């Protein structure tokens, strides 16, 4: 899944205008590893609540993007939130292509 960024950011002297998240490549071990990375970052995860921790979701997103989680922390707030939301959709088992957004703008 490619996500176009609202604001470009730089990591290791490379400028990114979009990021590719390959959620299909992730394994169960990757999710366990993401939980451990989150704990090492000092975030206490309650059993069963890991999927809802922003820090855990960030760790999963970073694994899917093959970037360190610290790099994603430098994204704009809008881009960061969008990426976390897309990662939550993945973690919930929903297909983002089947989700509908009801836009009722006046």
Regions found by a protein language model. Give the residues of each.
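Short, surface-exposed, charged amphipathic helix/loop patches that serve as local interaction elements
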Residues: 1-106
């Amino acid at each position: 899944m490619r996500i176009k960024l609202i604001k470009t950011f730089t990591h290791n002297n490379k400028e990114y205008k979009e990021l590719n998240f390959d959620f299909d490549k992730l394994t169960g071990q990757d999710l366990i590893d993401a939980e451990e990375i989150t704990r090492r970052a000092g975030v206490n995860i309650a059993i069963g609540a890991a999927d809802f921790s922003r820090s855990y979701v960030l760790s999963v997103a970073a694994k899917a993007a093959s970037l360190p989680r610290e790099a994603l922390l430098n994204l704009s707030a809008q881009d960061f939130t969008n990426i976390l939301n897309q990662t939550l959709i993945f973690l919930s088992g929903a297909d983002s292509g089947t989700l509908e957004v009801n836009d009722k703008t006046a």
